[in-house]
């Protein structure tokens, strides 16, 4: 009899839960050995990876997949090199598991502190890019978690081939293959099952378009680590160094249009707008960026009228909204109303103004004189990241190894007894 999707996912979940107990107590050396061996396996399997990837690319071309998506799907030699390097880099990162902090003596004589422990089983749901399989698997493995990976159906052959290499690495280190499992059915029912198994899955991390993430957030019966949009702002204050502001704003928008940390709205203090905007517009127009502005912006530079929808939009493209504001308070109000709580930056040489901005802007990352595109795990010194969270529970900002662990209390005594009057 053919196994149902629910039965299949239950089998994966049960195997992952059992494997999580093994990887959770594995030594740092054993986990690093698995990562290095997986990197070696990827290097040795380049032909297999290319063949599997070509199956996905051929299917994508036949189904009319857009060129940009085909590009994201492709496993070029350089991208395989990047995956190998990524595995080795994660192996070199400090292991957060077992770290104890804040040990202190209480008046009773007991010591109390906190220990980092794995979350358990992490479900990752993502689209298109097969290299996410490596990013997610390596971070979960190093942080002592088992993972169930559900990639996009367009990358099914590539993801299977990559998972096989990772499982070879696990076997070489004496760890169970179920530490990293790829969902091998393209049936969408598998996603519904994965997000509805709290007995087997401890947290879900969705990576993809807004529709996917909204659906997961709405329907999941387990906690979700996510961000919906990257509507990032830069505010150029009246106390800005304009040379610095031109360079920072230009980099924030044009470094890469398609990343969640790209600036989407530029806010400019009215006191500097007439000096700042003409040169800023010249640079953006020369780069091919379409400008959309408020009425005060349009009175200074040539720009299309910005609509209410523009302030809510993550373009992920060469389009920028510009608004002239009365001052710092209006800039903060705009960001907190229209922003996505991702990353926002102020350009200013005034320390008090910068402190107010950082205290009052409700975002996962707040910056001073820094392009928003620096919102990245590697740039923050976290190593690789599994994503960026705009939630306030459990992790906020780039989620690296430590974000894939939690803390439990450690209490050490020497036979102390609690007295009746201490309750």
Swiss-Prot record:
Pathway: Amino-acid biosynthesis; L-proline biosynthesis; L-glutamate 5-semialdehyde from L-glutamate: step 2/2. Keywords: Amino-acid biosynthesis, Cytoplasm, NADP, Oxidoreductase, Proline biosynthesis. One of its GO terms (biological process) is L-proline biosynthetic process. GO terms for cellular component: cytoplasm. Pfam families: Aldedh. GO terms for molecular function: glutamate-5-semialdehyde dehydrogenase activity; NADP binding. It is found in: Cytoplasm. It catalyses: L-glutamate 5-semialdehyde + phosphate + NADP(+) = L-glutamyl 5-phosphate + NADPH + H(+). Its EC number is 1.2.1.41. PROSITE patterns: PROA. PANTHER family: DELTA-1-PYRROLINE-5-CARBOXYLATE SYNTHASE (PTHR11063:SF8), GLUTAMATE SEMIALDEHYDE DEHYDROGENASE (PTHR11063). Catalyzes the NADPH-dependent reduction of L-glutamate 5-phosphate into L-glutamate 5-semialdehyde and phosphate. The product spontaneously undergoes cyclization to form 1-pyrroline-5-carboxylate. Belongs to the gamma-glutamyl phosphate reductase family. This is Gamma-glutamyl phosphate reductase. It comes from Pseudomonas putida (strain ATCC 700007 / DSM 6899 / JCM 31910 / BCRC 17059 / LMG 24140 / F1).
């Amino acid at each position: 009899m053919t196994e149902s999707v629910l039965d299949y996912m239950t089998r994966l979940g049960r195997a992952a839960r059992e494997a999580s107990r093994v990887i959770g107590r594995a030594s740092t050396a054993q986990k690093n050995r698995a990562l290095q061996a997986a990197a070696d396996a990827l290097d040795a399997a380049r032909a297999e990876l290319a063949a599997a990837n070509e199956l996905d690319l051929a299917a994508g071309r036949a189904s009319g997949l857009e060129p940009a998506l085909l590009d994201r799907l492709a496993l070029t030699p350089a991208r395989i090199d990047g995956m190998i390097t990524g595995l080795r880099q994660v192996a070199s990162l400090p292991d957060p598991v077992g770290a104890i902090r804040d040990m202190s003596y209480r008046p009773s004589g007991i010591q109390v502190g906190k220990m980092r422990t794995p979350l358990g089983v992490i479900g990752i749901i993502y689209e298109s890019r097969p290299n996410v399989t490596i990013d997610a698997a390596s971070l979960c493995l190093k942080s002592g978690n088992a993972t169930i990976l559900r990639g996009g159906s367009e990358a099914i052959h590539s993801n299977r081939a990559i998972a096989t290499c990772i499982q070879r690495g696990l076997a070489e280190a004496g760890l169970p293959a179920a530490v990293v499992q790829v969902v091998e059915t393209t049936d969408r029912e598998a996603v519904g099952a994965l997000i509805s198994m709290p007995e087997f899955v401890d947290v879900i991390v969705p990576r993809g378009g807004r529709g996917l993430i909204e659906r997961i957030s709405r329907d999941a019966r387990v906690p979700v680590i996510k961000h919906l949009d990257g509507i990032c702002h830069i505010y150029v204050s009246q106390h800005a160094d304009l040379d610095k502001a031109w360079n920072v704003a230009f980099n924030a928008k044009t470094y890469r249009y398609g990343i969640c940390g790209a600036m989407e709205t530029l806010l400019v203090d009215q006191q500097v707008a007439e000096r700042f905007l003409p040169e800023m517009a010249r640079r953006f127009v020369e780069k091919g960026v379409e400008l959309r502005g408020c009425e005060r912006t349009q009175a200074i530079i040539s720009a299309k009228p910005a609509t209410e929808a523009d302030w809510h939009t993550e373009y992920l493209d060469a389009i920028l909204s510009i608004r002239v504001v009365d001052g710092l308070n209006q800039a903060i109000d705009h960001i907190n109303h229209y922003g996505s709580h991702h990353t926002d930056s102020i350009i200013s040489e005034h320390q008090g103004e910068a402190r107010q901005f950082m205290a009052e802007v409700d975002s996962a990352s707040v910056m001073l004189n820094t392009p928003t595109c620096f919102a990245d795990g590697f740039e923050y010194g976290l190593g690789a990241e599994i994503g960026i969270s705009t939630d306030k529970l459990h992790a906020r900002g780039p989620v690296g190894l430590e974000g894939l662990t939690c803390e439990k209390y450690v209490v050490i005594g020497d036979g102390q007894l609690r007295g009746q009057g201490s309750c």
